[in-house]
Amino acid sequence: MGLARALRRLSGALEPGNSRAGDEEEAGAGLCRNGWAPGPVAGSRRRGRFVKKDGHCNVRFVNLGGQGARYLSDLFTTCVDVRWRWMCLLFSCSFLASWLLFGLTFWLIASLHGDLAAPPPPAPCFSQVASFLAAFLFALETQTSIGYGVRSVTEECPAAVAAVVLQCIAGCVLDAFVVGAVMAKMAKPKKRNETLVFSENAVVALRDHRLCLMWRVGNLRRSHLVEAHVRAQLLQPRVTPEGEYIPLDHQDVDVGFDGGTDRIFLVSPITIVHEIDSASPLYELGRAELARADFELVVILEGMVEATAMTTQCRSSYLPGELLWGHRFEPVLFQRGSQYEVDYRHFHRTYEVPGTPVCSAKELDERAEQASHSPKSSFPGSLTAFCYENELALSCCQEEDEEEDTKEGTSAETPERAASPQALTPTLALTLPP
């Protein structure tokens, strides 16, 4: 009975028009050119973050065989990675175990020599050590070099001398391990990430006539991040042409590696730009498709801490709902007199750019190609359009001029000052066609 049922299933699977093959064809037809689905599968819930906004990875390891032995084999890294309370507890227990072990050793040596008898011998191994508590105190005083001057070792027992020498060596090794682990934990560049910030949202807007994905990074400290560079990856489930389902596929997002623009000089906040071209995983996504997409953009900032020369890595992520289509970041860098000023009040702020195309970059390229072959090509922008950055630059310039006029007691404004905006923002109000 069971064999017949299995044969029927096998024959049905070998038929050329079986339903499974049709399902695979339908699934393959719904994929983009890179094998990625344009949106979440119908009926499936949106997946959680793989990398949280604070940079922690939302990953939990289970069913690890021999996890404790593997961690103990790299004890120093384990001590550096654990929390401070567990680290202090571990080191306290280590010192206490060392004192107890050598205290027990000294007590056994004294007991075997007869120092604990009622009438003590005339030449004991340890002076003033007549109990286990006294032996424990002697071990404590020896390892910590307290030196009260009451208890001491004599030359009567070579074993006692050897035990004292061994404890001194073990104490030095333990002290070096503890000091090294504490210093390594204090100097970890992990805390440096607290002063490296990403913008809360990423934006999609036109830059140099191309749709670009942009986000902002900033350094809150005066100390620089040496050899700072950025990279990004797009995480999304993918189905291969062979039907293999990859739950979390990683694809690099180009942020200027070939041109060297991924290397940044992070003195003031910088906007990272990813040009959405034919090699971009976002090439076929418009505003509507982006809202329905199911992916996660992981952004990474790496560099060396100037004070310690240790490499640090700061991470964050953006979901499709955190990608603002048709927005730009407000400027944050201004010039005040002879100095430059960074106003972090505008760091996360964006403003909407009217006229941003809602189609995908692929459709935009196709339209541009058709317009190039057309005898009448209209310029998409308005010649009377004025940039928000220019307005903010001029307003800041006027505020600075008013402050200087108030200090100097003059109400007249010189033409040179009125014509020079003091904000480091794009000052071209018009964008001429190529």
Curated annotation (Swiss-Prot):
Q: State the organism of origin.
A: Mus musculus
* Family stated for the protein in its record: Belongs to the inward rectifier-type potassium channel (TC 1.A.2.1) family. KCNJ14 subfamily.
**Top-down, what is the taxonomic lineage of the species of origin?**
Eukaryota, Metazoa, Chordata, Craniata, Vertebrata
Residue ranges of the motif Selectivity filter: 145-150
Q: Per its UniProt record, what InterPro entries does this chain match?
A: Ig_E-set (IPR014756), IRK_C (IPR041647), K_chnl_inward-rec_Kir (IPR016449), K_chnl_inward-rec_Kir_cyto (IPR013518), Kir_TM (IPR040445)
Q: Does the keyword Transport apply?
A: yes
Compartments, record wording: Membrane
Task: Quickly give the catalysed reaction.
Answer: K(+)(in) = K(+)(out)
Q: List, as start-end ranges, the regions of compositional bias called Low complexity.
A: 418-434
Concerning Gene3D superfamilies, the annotation shows: 1.10.287.70, G protein-activated inward rectifier potassium channel 1
Q: Where is the composition biased (Basic and acidic residues)?
A: 407-416
| Sequence positions bearing S-nitrosocysteine | 79
Name the segments for region: Disordered: 398-434
Q: Which residues lie on this side of the membrane: Extracellular?
A: 109-131, 149-157
UniProt keyword terms in alphabetical order: Ion channel, Ion transport, Membrane, Potassium, Potassium transport, S-nitrosylation, Transmembrane, Transmembrane helix, Transport, Voltage-gated channel
Q: What does this protein do?
A: Inward rectifier potassium channels are characterized by a greater tendency to allow potassium to flow into the cell rather than out of it. Their voltage dependence is regulated by the concentration of extracellular potassium; as external potassium is raised, the voltage range of the channel opening shifts to more positive voltages.
User: Could you name the Gene Ontology cellular component terms for this entry?
Assistant: monoatomic ion channel complex
Q: Does the keyword Transport apply?
A: yes
Give the Cytoplasmic compartment stretches of this protein.
1-81, 186-434
Intramembrane residues: 132-148
Q: Which residues cross the membrane?
A: 82-108, 158-185
Name-wise, this protein is ATP-sensitive inward rectifier potassium channel 14
Pfam families, sorted: IRK (PF01007), IRK_C (PF17655)
Gene Ontology terms for molecular function: inward rectifier potassium channel activity
